[in-house]
């Protein structure tokens, strides 16, 4: 049976159609009220992105959802997890740094009007096991224990491309976004018994080049970064003691992308499918009936919000999608992105990508060219949703209702009445005419196009 996906496009002709309030109406249409009881704890799962990336979820969008939950008499809480320990540095790998980043992006208790849980602890070691009974690859994953305290979960996602997941949406925001550190490693196959990190092989040629750099150099960083002392320089060679490796993943990205170590291609090619497996495990553990999904298809970039930068949007803004089915809501976004025109000059404005229905994220986002349909098909296989959907175009909220949220006065108590004494005491005398009757610059000179560009140059030319 086809799942319902509720949708509103990117246009706005009055306040009720503004982006923050689209999700409010769509959540109502999708039946959020039936999922929320007064006094319940409602988790709002977000991903704020890394510092430097501004094509991410807006605080205003999330705040509107927070206020809708509060109007229902429930207790909203923003929930997020720390980044996996898979690099020497990073914005969100420990709670202190993560909170610093979300503050920079406008997410804190004051701006959101509710608590923010960065689940759980500095490195999310307090987690629970989530069985994946029908996983394509995974047998189980892990989610922070604090997630089990939630009565309802609104998963709010920015839809975009992804280097490893091929695309990021609702499924990934659970499969990775609600996984603990161990869960994230499992999803990336980093602790796989055959293909995991301990199977990595040192590229000695690259290592020798790196060791020639002045100290402290990259090799020093890799050695110091391993909490289990797996790396060393012995007899002039860079050595990986795999028998010491505990698959913590701290070395993965720096050694992979630098070419210092070679890992099985399976680590990359299985990621989208494992994301869906992990999503299924976490949803089954917490209760599938607790979930509802909001996908914002705006600022659709070729790469993920995990990056500390963002490229130009590859597709024009499409709109807001809401469903109780994570597979269907992602499928609706994928098909809308496949049907849309691409933005001129963007990464997708290229042969093989610009044409509709060309599997754009497969060929334009995924590092390993993994199909964008893997998450969808694996989600169906895991029983968390359906790829077939009915797209229901919703009607906006009334401008009157939205206005009542924006301002705390109305026609019965207008601002002139409320602040009568203060207004009457204000000094309105302009101390003479503020303008002349005839313009000093004739109208024909005001409207003509002025001289513009004289020369194109680069900063290197000046240097």
Stretch-by-stretch model annotation:
Residues 2-46, 51-61, 67-68, 72-79, ...:
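Extended, low-polarity segments enriched in aliphatic/aromatic residues
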């Amino acid at each position: 049976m086809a799942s319902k996906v509720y949708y509103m496009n990117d246009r706005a002709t009055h306040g009720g159609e503004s982006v923050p309030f689209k999700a409010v109406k769509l959540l109502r249409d999708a039946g959020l009220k039936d999922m929320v009881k007064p006094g319940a704890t409602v988790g709002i799962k977000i991903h704020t992105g890394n510092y430097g990336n501004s094509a991410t979820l807006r605080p205003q969008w999330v705040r509107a959802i927070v206020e809708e939950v509060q109007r229902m008499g429930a207790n909203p809480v923003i929930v997020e997890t720390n980044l996996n320990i898979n690099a020497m540095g990073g914005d969100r790998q420990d709670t202190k740094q993560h909170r610093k980043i979300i503050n920079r992006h406008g997410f804190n208790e004051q701006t959101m009007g509710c608590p923010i849980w960065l689940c759980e602890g500095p490195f999310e070691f307090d987690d629970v096991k989530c069985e994946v009974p029908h996983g394509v690859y995974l047998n189980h994953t892990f989610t922070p224990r604090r997630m089990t305290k939630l009565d309802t979960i609104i998963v709010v996602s920015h839809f975009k491309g992804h280097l490893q997941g091929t695309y990021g949406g609702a499924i990934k925001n659970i499969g990775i976004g609600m996984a603990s550190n161990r869960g994230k490693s499992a999803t990336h196959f980093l602790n796989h018994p055959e293909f995991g990190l301990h199977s990595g092989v040192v590229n000695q040629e690259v290592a020798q080049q790196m060791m020639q750099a002045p100290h402290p150099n990259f090799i020093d960083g890799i050695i110091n970064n391993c909490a289990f002392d797996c790396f060393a320089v012995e007899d002039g060679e860079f050595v990986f003691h795999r028998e010491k490796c505990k698959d913590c993943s701290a070395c993965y990205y720096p050694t992979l992308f630098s070419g210092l170590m070679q890992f099985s291609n399976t680590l990359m090619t299985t990621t989208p499918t494992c994301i869906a497996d992990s999503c299924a495990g976490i949803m089954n553990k917490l209760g599938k009936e607790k979930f509802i999904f909001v996908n914002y298809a705006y600022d659709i970039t070729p790469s993920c919000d995990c990056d500390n930068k963002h490229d130009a949007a590859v597709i024009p803004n499409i709109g807001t999608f809401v469903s109780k089915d994570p597979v269907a809501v992602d499928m609706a976004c994928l098909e809308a992105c496949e049907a849309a025109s691409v933005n001129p000059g963007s990464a997708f404005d290229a042969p093989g990508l610009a044409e509709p229905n060309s599997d754009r994220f497969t060929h334009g986002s995924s590092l390993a060219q993994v199909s964008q349909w893997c998450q969808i098909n694996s989600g169906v296989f895991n029983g968390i949703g359906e790829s077939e959907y009915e797209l229901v175009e919703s009607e906006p909220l009334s401008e009157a209702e939205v206005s009542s949220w924006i301002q705390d006065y109305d026609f019965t108590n207008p601002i002139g009445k409320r602040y009568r004494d203060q207004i009457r005491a204000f000094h309105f005398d302009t101390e003479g005419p503020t303008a002349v009757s005839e313009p000093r610059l004739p109208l024909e000179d005001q409207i003509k196009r002025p001289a513009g560009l004289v020369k194109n140059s680069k900063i290197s030319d000046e240097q």
